[in-house]
Amino acid sequence: MSTPLIVFFSTTLPWLLTDKVLSARNPEIPIRKLRVRFCLRPDECLSISQAVARAMATHKKLDVAEFVVLTEKICMKCTEDHLLCYAKRFNTWIGDCPVVFAGLTHLWLRNLRFGELDIPNILTTCKRLESLRLTYCDAGVCSVLQVEHAQLVELHIDYGEFEAVHLNCLPKLQRVKYVGWSYQEDPLIFGSVPQLSKLTLEQVGVNSTSHIQLSQLLANVPWISDLRLDFKSEKIWVLPEHPKLLAPVLGKLQIVNLGNLPQGCDIAWTMFILEAASSLKELCITVWDHWCKMETDKDVRKELGYCEKANVEWQTGNHPQFILSTRIWLSSPSTASNLRTTLCDTLGA
């Protein structure tokens, strides 16, 4: 039996050569995965679409068909005019080539400012889509994203100006990751997501960053089993709550990863999760001031509202027996022994 081929093309290849390689492929040796990474230029997009359409027609059992769409300017150099221009290009392209997008399973977009209905229209066109990643994409400042899709399994959002993301009806959605939301209310509103199992939230907290209450955020998804929170070595933005409030939403939780807590922060507050999550099997805590990624200039920190390191107050109670069976990982570049001592003191071990 012939071995299925995995094909990856980048913008460094001339597209005439790309088309030639795809068209010359023996149909009896199927392509299973086709990943194409390219820049959003009108002529290139059309050439890519034609080449990929022929590959889809020839190799009808493509397990993965992915577009990773770049823009000519990186996010930090994009003005609003750039974002609007790139989104207009993309909308023209998808309108000209709906058949190709209907066959995609994975799509990663960057640096696009859409209209209100554009992203829902993209989801409607991409009928097979299983994974969507939006990096510095939105529908304008304070826009609200409404997401519905029958096949989507994974949603990943990096930054952008969404005021809220409503996950309305996603029957197959399993994984959600949201990095760097812009506003103070809960960044995600969960509707019908019956298979959601993994949630990852990453945020650089400043003085104005509101605390998230897990009892409210997860009220409609009490079946989540894997929760990952990354604090980027800055303010703790999760509010410790009484176990009686949290137990109904954390009862199915098996894995918790608390990443990049600021050094010097007392980790006793993390015990509220242990007290509420009766099915927890693994708790991983990383305490680290990541100087390569943190803002270190004192004046800039003051101007942007970064806060001084402050402990989160939490009065620990009596720890139930199931905590003793939870595997706990503690990681810190310089204070691992202190972390273990703190945790043992907290648990009374």
Go through each PLM region and give its residues.
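Leucine-rich repeat
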Residues: 1-148, 158
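Conserved hydrophobic beta-strand positions in leucine-rich repeat
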Residues: 2, 32-39, 63-68, 81, ...
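Acidic, proline/serine/threonine- and glycine-rich low-complexity intrinsically disordered segments
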Residues: 2-12, 317-320, 326, 331-348
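Short, solvent-exposed loop/turn at the beta-strand->alpha-helix junction
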Residues: 14, 41-48, 72-78, 90-92, ...
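LRR flanking "cap" motifs
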Residues: 19-31, 245, 319-329
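Short loop/turn segments at connectors of secondary-structure elements within structured domains
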Residues: 28-30, 266-267, 279, 340
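A structural signal for leucine-rich repeat
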Residues: 49-56, 76-103, 120-128, 143-153, ...
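Loop/turn-rich, solvent-exposed surfaces of beta-rich toroidal or solenoidal domains
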Residues: 258-292
